[in-house]
């Protein structure tokens, strides 16, 4: 194992940020996994799981159990970690311009498609190597205008040629859930079973280029553009939502890290255990991200929930109220679709149009940008 420090572009004189990168195994030997924690810097359960994961991976590396190459960024957003506003941590949006740290990650698809045009054939192994080299070259050619651009670019360079990318996040109040590409449903189910996920949200494009899709979608698009070529989806990239922001127990973090380690074992990144355990039963079936129903406040007031994260909701069921503090009127909010309420806000004051909760339904068919701000 070794630790590398990557300096980010400076914002102002006297102020520096850097990324710490932990590496296990040997680059170029076997499958590569890239794991990063808390790109949304206030989603701190990811930071704790990363520490547990580091301990487990370091022990495995010392024992010669890392067959491939594992890159772990234990805190993926030093800029966001430093942001405080009125004594409150602000880690989701850049205070400089309000941009979401996990949106508009550079999309290398067009550059790579041009680089490999007419060069993909019937040899899948050769095709994967060619596309990976083109991805590395495209990422190396990116330039940054500010520290946040540089952050996204440096993280992308660490992960763009990986077989597996695990982007560790959490929600406000939530159960374990995952986001992934629709064609990679089987791998999402395997990881979801190990983690005990209660929702798995799938899409071919969620909008605004989040980090996981910046790594996986180039493969999907190239395969769509060149169906005659033998080109597998060679990067499995997923966003892992590690429950809610207050779920920071040590035992829970060790459990989640062990599940991620087991997934890496099953994918050949780590040596298999001497006595492999059977895959746990899946706690949910994947559903389309387009079917996820946002529960939206009809006006301002105090929020009262009738459902807890992880509970099933029936179509038409009352899930929350918003109580007007001028009139005392209680505005009930009913779900349109059936499914599990997998996340909700942690605060209890609503403004008109605020997203209060999310239900993993199957009947809606939303279009456009499918993720929240």
Language-model features, listed with the residues they occupy:
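Structured catalytic-domain cores with a bias toward divalent-metal coordination
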Residues: 1-373
């Amino acid at each position: 194992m070794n630790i590398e420090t990557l300096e980010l572009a400076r914002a102002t004189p006297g102020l520096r940020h850097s990324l710490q990168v932990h590496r296990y195994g040997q680059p170029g030997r076997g499958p590569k996994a890239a794991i990063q924690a808390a790109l949304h810097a206030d989603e701190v359960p990811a930071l704790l799981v990363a520490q547990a994961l580091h301990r487990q991976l370091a022990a495995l590396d010392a024992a010669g159990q890392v067959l491939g190459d594992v890159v772990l960024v234990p805190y993926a957003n030093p800029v966001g970690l430093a942001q405080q506003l009125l004594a409150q941590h602000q880690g989701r949006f850049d205070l400089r311009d309000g941009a979401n740290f996990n949106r508009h990650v550079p999309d290398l698809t067009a550059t790579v498609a041009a680089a490999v045009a007419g060069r993909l054939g019937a040899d899948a192994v050769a095709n994967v190597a060619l596309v990976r080299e083109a991805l590395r070259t495209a990422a190396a050619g990116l330039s940054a205008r500010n520290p946040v651009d540089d952050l996204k670019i440096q993280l992308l360079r660490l992960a763009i040629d990986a077989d597996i990318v695990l982007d560790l996040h959490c929600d406000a109040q939530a159960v374990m859930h995952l986001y992934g590409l629709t064609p990679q449903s089987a791998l999402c189910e395997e990881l979801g079973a190990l983690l005990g996920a209660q929702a798995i949200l799938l899409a071919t494009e969620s909008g605004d280029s989040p980090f996981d899709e910046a790594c996986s979608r180039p493969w999907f698009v190239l395969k769509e553009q060149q169906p005659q070529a033998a080109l597998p989806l060679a990067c499995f990239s997923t966003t892992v939502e590690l429950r809610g922001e207050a779920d920071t127990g040590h035992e829970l973090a060790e459990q989640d890290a062990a599940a991620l380690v087991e997934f890496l074992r099953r994918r050949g990144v780590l040596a298999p255990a001497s006595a492999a355990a059977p895959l746990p039963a899946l706690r949910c079936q994947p559903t389309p991200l387009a079917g996820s129903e946002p529960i939206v406040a009809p006006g301002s007031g105090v929020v009262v929930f009738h459902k807890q994260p992880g509970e099933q909701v029936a179509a038409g069921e009352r899930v929350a109220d918003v109580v007007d503090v001028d009139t005392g009127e209680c505005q009930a909010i009913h779900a349109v679709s059936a499914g599990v309420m997998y996340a909700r806000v942690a605060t209890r004051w609503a403004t008109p149009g605020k997203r209060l909760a999310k239900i993993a339904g199957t009947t809606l068919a939303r279009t456009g940008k499918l993720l929240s701000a």
